[in-house]
Amino acid sequence: MSKNRSSLQSGPLNSELLEEQKQEIYEAFSLFDMNNDGFLDYHELKVAMKALGFELPKREILDLIDEYDSEGRHLMKYDDFYIVMGEKILKRDPLDEIKRAFQLFDDDHTGKISIKNLRRVAKELGETLTDEELRAMIEEFDLDGDGEINENEFIAICTDS
């Protein structure tokens, strides 16, 4: 299998990525290389990219495969996946990432994170928190005193500002 991470240990991309980001790329590839052949086909690539937070149109994914597929097999090997995803991760706008995270909490699209939203996320993460604990979390960061966390308050939490 071509998932040899040591071959990618040199180069500018490698020095810019955090260890956690490198691990996420490796895990996404490994998880979605369904037949363990060391390559991702279109469908595997699409879900691996989505797992890393990137949803590209079909045409763009096919173009990426064509760009890196020197053998005409319509597959992407790990080294190429690492390069493509590493570059995409480094180009991410941190503010966009925070806003995307906010949307995961705000599943009812009210523009605010309520105790109900927080309870759902805690449950999804396997955390058992009382309403009192959830309320305390919201009160800690609720700058306008409305009992909920709006997007600006969430951004402030995530950026320590």
Swiss-Prot record:
Entry's Gene Ontology molecular function annotations: calcium ion binding; identical protein binding; microtubule binding
Keyword Manganese: no
CDD domains (UniProt xref): EFh (cd00051)
Positions of Ca(2+) 1 binding: 33, 35, 37, 44
Residue numbers binding Ca(2+) 2: 142, 144, 146, 148, 153
Keyword presence, Zinc: no
Bilayer-crossing regions: none
Stored SUPFAM superfamilies: EF-hand (SSF47473)
GO CC terms: cytoplasm; half bridge of spindle pole body; mitotic spindle pole body; nuclear envelope; transcription export complex 2
GO biological process, one term: Golgi vesicle transport
Residue ranges occupied by any EF-hand domain in the UniProt entry: 20-55, 56-91, 93-128, 129-161
Subcellular location per the Swiss-Prot or TrEMBL entry: Nucleus envelope; Cytoplasm, Cytoskeleton, Microtubule organizing center, Spindle pole body
Record key words, sorted: Calcium, Cell cycle, Cell division, Cytoplasm, Cytoskeleton, Metal-binding, Mitosis, Nucleus, Phosphoprotein, Repeat
Main function: Functions as a component of the spindle pole body (SPB) half-bridge. At the SPB, it is recruited by KAR1 and MPS3 to the SPB half-bridge and involved in the initial steps of SPB duplication. Also involved in connection with the protein kinase KIC1 in the maintenance of cell morphology and integrity. May play a role in vesicle-mediated transport, in a VPS13-dependent manner.
Protein's recorded name: Cell division control protein 31
